């Protein structure tokens, strides 16, 4: 089995591709089947959403695999009115919905309840199959810490009454 342990920026040779939905692309440890049928394991650092087009390599750099974002069931809102689109983004964000944001477009994993809510705001919602690339904040794909320059060797738990 190929073990992919690191992300790389570029490579002259791509030895395979793997097509993954967003739920698989948020995992740092995962057994996958490459598009050519070979087995591979992802052993990556945590806290990073894999994006379509990213390159993964094994420790030696002899295997380089391109990640492809799989088409999946999504709801897409297209709107030329920025105020209406901002209202939709506000209501979806208030519900902590992972959201793909592009000029004139919002996309989220298909949910008929959310579709109906947005239609109630006057937006047209289309259910479709498309790659889903949500904003990084939904999955903390940037380094994140709660550190503030000193350690807490022990955590005090609240007393139970």
Swiss-Prot record:
Belongs to the UreE family. One of its GO terms (molecular function) is nickel cation binding. One of its GO terms (cellular component) is cytoplasm. HAMAP family: UreE (MF_00822). SUPFAM superfamilies: Urease metallochaperone UreE, C-terminal domain, Urease metallochaperone UreE, N-terminal domain. CDD domains: UreE. It is found in: Cytoplasm. Pfam families: UreE_C, UreE_N. Residues 133-161 are annotated as: Disordered. One of its GO terms (biological process) is urea metabolic process. Transmembrane segments: none annotated. This is Urease accessory protein UreE. It comes from Pseudomonas putida (strain W619). SMART domains: UreE_N. Keywords: Chaperone, Cytoplasm, Nickel. InterPro entries: UreE, UreE_C_dom, UreE_N, UreE_N_sf. The keyword tRNA processing does not apply.
């Amino acid at each position: 089995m190929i073990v992919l342990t690191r992300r790389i920026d570029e490579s002259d040779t791509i030895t395979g591709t793997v097509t993954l939905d967003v739920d698989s692309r948020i995992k740092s440890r995962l057994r996958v089947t490459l598009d050519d049928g070979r087995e591979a394991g992802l052993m990556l650092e945590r806290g990073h959403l894999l994006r379509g087009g990213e390159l993964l390599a094994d420790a030696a750099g002899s295997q380089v695999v391109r990640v492809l974002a799989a088409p999946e069931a999504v709801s897409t809102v297209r709107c030329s009115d920025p105020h209406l689109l901002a209202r939709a983004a506000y209501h979806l964000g208030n519900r902590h919905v992972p959201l793909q944001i592009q000029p004139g477009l919002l996309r989220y994993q298909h949910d008929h309840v959310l579709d109906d809510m947005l239609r109630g705001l006057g937006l047209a919602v289309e259910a479709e199959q498309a790659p889903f690339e949500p904003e990084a904040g939904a999955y903390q794909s940037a380094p994140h810490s709660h550190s503030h320059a000193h350690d807490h060797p022990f955590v005090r738990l609240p007393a139970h009454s």
